[in-house]
Amino acid sequence: KRQSIKPAASVTLDKASLTLDKGKSSVISAKMGGGSGLTDFVSWKSSNSKIASVSNGKVTAKGVGRATITAYTTGGKNVKCTVTVKGKISDSSISAIKTQSYTGKAVSPAPAVTYGGKKLVKNTDYTVSYSKNTAIGQASVKITGKGLYKGTKTVNFNIRPATVTKLKVSSTGEKSVKLSWKKVTGADSYAIYRYD
């Protein structure tokens, strides 16, 4: 008796969505239903292979972003899986923070954050929080990933007393001078040097 060959009536995936860290991989399994399935097989395609490539259902995360993986049957059926690839903030580059001057208020420098040569956007790709930034000494800024970025990275910076300004010199005699200046917030002493 000759068997009637019919294409699969449907195809499903074991994952409707998938989140991967850049450089990682995972396998998506396809299952066909209905029909004989004797001549049906699944082919795979990525909407953006620079973000996520696929080979026989194995998805490899190539770059940060989103891509759609589609499984096609020879019978014309298809099903999709949305892949999100995330980058680690620990792999980002953060610009050095120069020494800051104490102001009596919170000192909050804004470092530039780049990932793979791309400048990230504050409050879209990451958020910042500060520690010990209201006093003279060492402070820190913590970068926390957001959206397509994950994890944290901390950078330290120094806060020093502001430079003395409005220095005035007046003579009080042949062997003495009087110095006056604007008070520096946070300074508890001043050093005066004499140069011959």
State where each predicted segment sits.
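Pro/Thr/Ser/Gly-rich low-complexity, intrinsically disordered linker/stalk tracts
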Residues: 160-186
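N-terminal non-catalytic regions of secreted/periplasmic and cell-surface proteins
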Residues: 92-93, 177
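Extracytoplasmic soluble-region selector
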Residues: 1-91, 99-101, 105-138, 142-157
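Extracellular low-complexity, O-glycosylation-prone stalks/linkers
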Residues: 184-196
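Glycine-centered loop/turn positions within well-structured domains
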Residues: 50, 67, 175, 188-190
